[in-house]
Amino acid sequence: MSNRTSLLGAVTLFAVLSSACAQQYTGPPADLVIRNAKVVTIDHDNRRAQAVAMIGEEIIGVTSNRAIGQYIEEGTTQVIDADRRLVIPGFNDAHAHWASLNPDYIELRYITDKNIITEGVRERVAQVQPGELIRGGHWEHEMFTDKQWPTKELLDEVAPNNPVSLSRADGHSVLVNSYVLRASGITNDTPDPFGGEIQRDPVTGEATGIFKESASSLLNYNAVRVERTPEEQAERSRRGWDAANEMAMRLGVTSIQHPGGGNADLYQSMLDEGRLPYRIDVAGRLTDNADALARYDELRKRFPPEGNWIRFGYLKGFIDGTLGSGTALFFEPFEDEPDKSGLAMMPYEDLERQILASDAMGFQIGIHAIGTKANNWILNAWEKAQEVNGVRDSRHRSEHAQVLIDEDIPRFAELGVIASMQPTHCITDKRFAEKRIGLERSAGAYAWRRLLDAGVHIAFGTDYSVEPLEPLEGLYAAVTRKDRAGEEGDGWFPDQKLTMEEAIELYTLGAAYAQFMEDRKGMLKVGYLADMIIMDNDLLTIPEDEIMTSNVDYTIVGGKIVYQRDGAR
């Protein structure tokens, strides 16, 4: 143990004892102090403070303006005068598909005119060589004027000699052009794979260019490889990651839980270079393969849960699709497609077998589950795992837990299952939810209040890049349940709204609990990691229409200022 670690341990213990005994702090001076603030700690034993003191990575004082002076030494301690601004724990995104930013990606989020797709592809074709793959996405057909799915005809005229792949916003459907269909050998007779659907013209039976879920595995892009030198590729990667990291810091995201995978060694190299400004959990894929589980176990030993920066110990699986793509798995058919009730990504027996094997190895498991039947299945499988493997503090997770039947809500608490939810999905999906599943089933959608009242642990995230990496949009969604345009009224199923402080807690302490880190992250408390943000507005008191336009003034990770907004004092 280093002298620095020993010192921090002693300082932490002394600070706790000092607080309990109302003694003066006499330890070493703080490295960083925030004072004259409105500190919302998320610590139920000490909800409010005015100042925070830090040494190294840890918090050593959460106190009043009067008492903070004892932590300050001129010339040693950096002091931020918050001028009564709000200080809260840093946002911990419990579900983000994290990646570097691709400058060549065609961004189609929020478009309402399908012709923008054509023009975006036309512009990109002019910049690439024939045969080079063109990628883009985040389009949402429910936002189009006609609310109809796009088809390959939007792409064929402008990209006859390039493969084009444009993902729907949810990432569960993709639009491709005829170049890709030919390269893939897709014909009218190509069958749908298990857990997937090739969308077809109802008259001709011809593929429209939309491939849902596992059907995308049939696609062969036959793309020309872009030749870059190793130096060019390294610089391109560096720029992409630096842009992504800057975005996270600008938005106050100090921790990321990456359920889709992630390269732990890449993050370690960035950490070693001083370029990793957030903490991150990476994941593996749910399996019952003994060799794969053994490899995951070795990775867990290299990046153990006791670590604070890069951690591994979570396996992710899928059991259904999404509401927007019409592939979420329900007990009853869809209202707008009565011949369909969603797609299972695997038979229940396979799900149960994989969960039993992974649970027996002590892994935390998260399953993508949107529909009522999907969530019921995963609860049943986890109940079986407890019967077979025994009960432990597993904290398995329903990733999304979007639409639930009444009987399953208390089962989350009974089984210790975490509802890992993304509040912006509520205000995105509510545009079409009642059309797809009706009013009665919609009452069980994004049921935050009912889950909390039942004693269920909830963790909030964004599902980036399905939704923007914008925690403030999530907070707005949680407290209003209104669309981003600020519609009139009380919001969609307003009885499920949260208070702002509850929503912040689910983005901080709730997310930390979901990764077994509630003992050292998610609160502003002595001995906890010094991850926090200073806001330009008081989120607890401002009008709801100002929430999404508020800004993070400072982002602090491990006691270091990693972001300061231009013009922020």
Regions found by a protein language model. Give the residues of each.
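Bacterial N-terminal signal peptides
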Residues: 9-19
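Short proline/glycine-enriched turn/loop segments at secondary-structure junctions
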Residues: 303-304, 543-547
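Glycine- and charge-enriched low-complexity intrinsically disordered segments
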Residues: 564-569
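His/Asp/Glu-enriched, well-ordered alpha-helical/loop segment
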Residues: 228, 356-366, 370-396, 400-401, ...
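Acidic (Asp/Glu)-rich catalytic clusters
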Residues: 270-275, 300-307, 389-391, 412-416
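Divalent metal-binding segments
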Residues: 22-35, 40, 44-297, 313, ...
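Bacterial N-terminal signal peptides that target proteins for export
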Residues: 1-10
